[in-house]
Structure formats: C-alpha cells, structure tokens
Amino acid sequence: MLGDTMASWTGGIDFLRFCVIALNSVSPETSCRILIQPESIRKSLIALAKNGVKTLLGRRTMPLAGLPRNELIYALKSSGARIDVIDYQDTASDLADAMRRCNADVLFPCRISLGNSFPLPWVGYIPDLQHKRMPHWFSEAERRKRDDMFSKILDEAPAVVVNAAAVVQDIEEFYPNHKARLFALPFCPPAHLKKFSESYGLEVRAAYHLPARYFMVSNQFWIHKSHETAFMALRRVRDSGHDVHLVCTGKTLDYRWPEHFNDLKGIIEKNNLQEYIHILGLIPKRDQLTIMHESLAVIQPTLFEGGPGGGSVYDAISINTPSIVSDLPVNREIDIGVVRFFAAGSVDDLAAKMVDMLVTPPEMPSKEETYARLTLRQQEFGKFLLGILSMVAKGEFA
C-alpha cells in the first residue's frame, strides 16, 4: 500500500485502515506492506528541491508525505493486521525498487498516476470529483490541477477504485473517454466489538467539559461539511425547549477558505450558542469514539461526499451509534446501521429530525447483532478488494 498521499488527511488514513481490516478478514496470512518516505526535515527539504527541478525538466515526481508517518502507522497497526513499513525515496524508480525488495504483487491506492511505463502493477484511487460538482469551492488553478491529475489516473491506471457508485457516475459524466476499469467499493464500516468503559466515558466527558446530552459532528471544518446547518438547527432545537448541546471534533482549517472557521465562530456568537457548541479540534481517536458512543446521535450535515456518510458515519455505525445524515445521493448508498436522513442544507428539516431523535429515540440492535452483520459485510468488502488487486497483479486489465 502506498501511504504518502493518503496520510495527508484523516479520511485518507481511515480509508487505508478500513481496507487493511477488510483484507485481513479474508486473508489474515497476507502481510500488508506500507510504502512511505522517511520522515526527516533534511530529506524532505532535499526532496522538495528535487521535485522542483524535476517539474522544470518535465519529469515525473513523487508526492511528499503529509501528516507525520507515525500517525498513519499507528492507525494501521491498530487494525490488528500484520503491517510492515517499507521506506522509499522520492522517485518512481525507487518506489519500484522498494516494491521488489518486499516482493509486493501490486501497489494500491495511488492518488497520482505512476504512468504507463511504471514496471509493476498499480491501482489508482480517486476520492471524489468535488471540483466538478462544486467548482465554486476551488480556485481555477486547483481545478486544472485536479483535472490533470485525475485524467492521467483514468488514462494510465489499469483499474481505479472509488468509494461509491455515485463517484463512478460522476466519472462517467465528466471523463467519458477514460480507459481505466472503475470499481466502486461496497459500503462497509469496520466490524469490532469495542467495549466502552463507563468510567473512561465519565473521565473523557470531564476532561473535555461535556454536558450530559449532546449531538456530535465529527468532520474537519471544511466548507462543504456545512457545519452552519447543524449550528442553526441546534438553535431551533433549543428554542423549542430542548436542553441539548452540540460537540464538534476535527481539524479547524480549510486551506481553500482560511477564514471559514472564523465565519463559523461568528455564526455561533451571533446566535448566542457559545455555551452550547463545544469545538474540541482534532483529538485522539479513542477519545473521539468514546465521545461519539456517549452522544445522542452523530449529525452529518455535509453538502458533498465521495463516500457514503463520510468517515464519521462509518465510525458511528461501527460502534452502534445512530446518525442523522444529509440525503445526498451518495449518502443514500448507506444500507446498514441506524440512519435517519434530512434534506441536505435544510435547517428546519435537520432540527425536526433532531427533535424526533430526542422524543423518539431509535430502537438500536444489540452490539453483537451489529458486529455480526458488519463482519459479513467486511468479508464481502475484503473479497471484492482482494479480487481487484489480484486481477491487476495478474495483468488482466492490461
């Protein structure tokens, strides 16, 4: 597995973790090798300079690592699978050499094209086509960059994996002449019988100064996540007489819209919600899941996703927590778990669904029942992904 480009955002790390868990469920004897560049300031600066020279010369470059590699490695090893970490330098040739050193059959997922001349099998990955569906959220330069990157993947990869059937439909619409075979992964939150300690739950709640009753939004503060919809819905719910709060986790920076988080804070202040909205930022995964487990429900107000529900809904279903999710076509692909939908962008409809959740809590399946269903789904996911990787490794799509 190629770790560099997936480590640049928490959703990418979660995606790799889900894939490793699924593959391990059907082929536990198989070792997953994570290829990633060494984390070193000196080497990163040298690699950055090399990439600049290569760009001027028109030569292919490899992406630099995003988040610290330890975060990625820890997340993958927590899956329970056997993980081997393989270092490589910043060139495609060294990447190929690293694959040979560890006897890798195929490389996945590749968010940039390795080209037709790359000597070993590889599988492309496209998270979404947000720049096509929501172009106003991107600069012209970034739209061109994404177009070029995705066009190359779709022309040069033998197969490309996406997270939803909706993304396949988008690719067929915007890149109708693509050459790659497209595969939409089945919706599959990870199966685990995680036990939440009541004492640790109280400890976490005290540490973060959380109230007894709250909904949760667990997204990075990107503009398309539409936190403002949840904020205004909370205002309506409180005005209707319900004493409930909202807890938010996730990074607070949107690089495309640096002022977005300040705009959201302005909405909170304007509507006198400072006391009722708790923004915790990016917190340890264990704490995030504990807070999620203690919540009334996870709210997913997003206006765009590349996978059903986004990562927070995967986690919510996995730990048997209900969700209230915007009714985007991609989110309608959620076919497991306790989920209620609301009209995307509608403050009134979300508020109504929140009140309904307060007044009539859903009947939840047992944790054991959820685990059993997710285990079967996880094995289906693992077999499906393993089949794709095996076919590419054998050159069946060449």
Stretch-by-stretch model annotation:
Residues M1-A398:
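Carbohydrate transferase catalytic cores enriched for Leloir-type hexosyltransferases
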